[in-house]
Swiss-Prot record:
Ranges in a coiled coil: none
Organism: Guillardia theta (Cryptophyte)
Pfam families with a match to the protein in the record: TPR_12 (PF13424)
Identification of the protein by name: Uncharacterized protein ycf37
Keyword Hydrolase: no
UniProt similarity note: Belongs to the ycf37 family.
Gene that this polypeptide is encoded by: ycf37
Chief place where the protein resides: plastid
Entry keyword set: Chloroplast, Plastid, Repeat, TPR repeat
Length: 178
């Protein structure tokens, strides 16, 4: 009985340390993988063998590291090299640029690129969701509500849009009473 409490304490502490160790190793592994990919892409760029997708991937790596300026520069290079007949790819690229501008709170530029994405893929729900987020962030609740209604036109069972719509409707009703 006298050994049970110390045993449980040491076991619990060991489990916590094991979880921390696994987390640290997974973080190191993912960083290492991203850095190796970064080196590989930069080598392609130095050898002038990079295409739009390589610059896009490089931008995504910088975006994940929160280096937004470098990400935007690489996304713009990707835009210049991207195949114009790849509508889905262009929509994704424009959406990613818009997302990057959203991260640095440049909402006008973000909306510009989101609108460009919708020109290529009008029913791109991720872009519509991002536009709705910006309208909410800028307190343009009526436009946000319209965007979430538009999402529901394309995907009737979209739980995110339904929840946001219910929330916005409540806020708009409450604001009308004030």
């Amino acid at each position: 009985m006298s050994f049970l409490l110390p045993f449980l304490y040491v076991s619990g502490l060991s489990l916590i340390l094991l979880f921390i160790l696994v987390f640290i190793i997974s973080q190191i592994w993912s960083r290492r993988t991203a850095d190796l990919r970064l080196v590989s892409i930069q080598e392609k760029i130095r050898n002038a063998k990079a295409d739009g997708k390589d610059f896009y991937e490089l931008g995504v790596i910088f975006l994940s590291k929160k280096l937004y300026d470098q990400a935007i520069i690489n996304f713009r290079y990707a835009l210049n090299l991207w195949e114009l007949d790849d509508k889905t790819g262009l929509a994704n690229l424009y959406n990613t640029i818009g997302f990057t501008y959203t991260q640095i709170a440049q909402y006008d530029l973000a909306l510009f690129y989101y609108e460009k994405a919708l020109l290529h893929e009008p029913n791109y729900l991720v872009t519509l969701k991002n536009i709705g987020f910006i309208y909410e962030k800028t307190n343009n609740l009526v436009k946000a509500k319209d965007i979430y209604l538009q999402i529901l036109k394309y995907d009737v069972d979209n739980k995110f849009a339904t929840d946001k719509l219910n929330l916005l409707t409540g806020r708009l009703i409450r604001d009308d009473r004030i």
